[in-house]
Amino acid sequence: MSEIQPKTEVPPKTVEEEEESDDEEDNTKVTEGGNPTGGEGAAKKKKKKNKKKKKAAPVASAADIIDSKPIPSGLVQTNPPTIPVSKQFSNGVYPMGEIQEYRDSNSYRTTSEEKRLEERIHANIYNDVRRAAEVHRQVRKYVQGIVKPGLGLTELVESLENASRTLIEADGLKAGIAFPTGVSLNHIAAHFTPNTGDKTVLKKDDVLKIDFGTHVNGYIIDCAFTVTFDEKYDKLKDAVREATNTGIYHAGIDARLGEIGAAIQEVMESHEIELNGKTYPIRSIRNLNGHSIRPYVIHGGKTVPIVRGGEMTKMEEGEFYAIETFGSTGRAQVIEDLECSHYMKTDYQTTVRLPKAKQLLQYINKNYDTLCFCRRWLDRAGEDKHILALNNLCDLGIIQRHAPLVDSKGSYVAQYEHTLLLKPTAKEVLSRGDDY
């Protein structure tokens, strides 16, 4: 989720399977009269029945998590996906993302036993966010198989979000969707999800950005990609994907955010694209950024620019970052426009007098707290007459609107994004998959 600058296959066996148990055969011999051979007065032996036992779910050790392997091959998933990832990884250890070693003055970290011991302290956090990442990979694989011209955006986001809820075993604030699914088309760069009743249908000429998030215990995966149906847009996608990978490459402990932005812009703007006989430079959208991520807070306080001239603040050990870039054929600057769908609670607190607004705020606190939400989710939960109450909370400053961010009409914007973690020993690109 972007940050704008201030203006059916057979399921695998699981750990929950019960051991099969049959009634133990009665080996006592019985005579024609029906009495046991042990004598007239001997009592009949009762059949013994084994009690069914459930295997205890294994507890992943810190060592198992630290030594987690990349995604194993041969995972079984249905289509559409219905098997939670916890059932696929029965040992409770989820696969790590792509590991990139630190360079230069931090290269010692790769083999430092002291730094490796530090990682063990945070093993459970790593496992939580890797679970969220694995859900993201599997859901987007499914979505990449169903997205096509003629598909409605509402059907697309509902299919994606339902799959996410199932695979992550959504449970209130413990695990679930981290923010509304962005399905921004063409010149719309970010923050568009359909409100209830939206009838928008994908067309062959569209450039679609799919930006969605998952979380476990507040540890968020924020990851996005671009879908097109015409190869004429390939150079736009290639430029943005390369720019994002450049940002990831330059990220690391002690890396300066402004230098990362300069590197991203240099790569992005070395590309151009020809559309309908006219050549367009591909430019970084200067007022969109990547960002740090904190538990339950998608925009964690630090911004990762995608143009030169940014602050020289350093990245630090233990931080999570969403490295995302946007390339545009237009003016390369976005403004807020169109009907709002994204909302998020602020830190501001004040008295709420309107009963409906007070009731809605209680629901938001319980189900989303500081996570972003959308109007469609409120409708889904039965809060279908929420607009006046929601507007009241926005007017009070308790809730903030995040309207769609748009470039110039007629332009095309592409986006790629990954979430990474600056561990003590290495940089882990948590959301990396075999697709991008």
From Swiss-Prot:
Residues in coiled coil: none
CDD domains: MetAP2
Residues annotated for a divalent metal cation 1 binding in this entry: D211, D222, E417
Keywords of the record: Aminopeptidase, Cytoplasm, Hydrolase, Metal-binding, Protease
Binding-site positions, a divalent metal cation 2: D222, H291, E324, E417
Root EC class: hydrolase
Record bears the keyword Cytoplasm: yes
Chain spans, region Disordered: 1-61
Gene3D superfamilies on file: Creatinase/methionine aminopeptidase superfamily, Winged helix-like DNA-binding domain superfamily/Winged helix DNA-binding domain
Listed Pfam families: Peptidase_M24
Biological process annotations from GO: proteolysis
Listed Basic residues bias regions: 44-56
EC number(s) given by UniProt: 3.4.11.18
Similarity remark: Belongs to the peptidase M24A family. Methionine aminopeptidase eukaryotic type 2 subfamily.
Function description: Cotranslationally removes the N-terminal methionine from nascent proteins. The N-terminal methionine is often cleaved when the second residue in the primary sequence is small and uncharged (Met-Ala-, Cys, Gly, Pro, Ser, Thr, or Val).
Protein name: Methionine aminopeptidase 2
Organism name: Dictyostelium discoideum (Social amoeba)
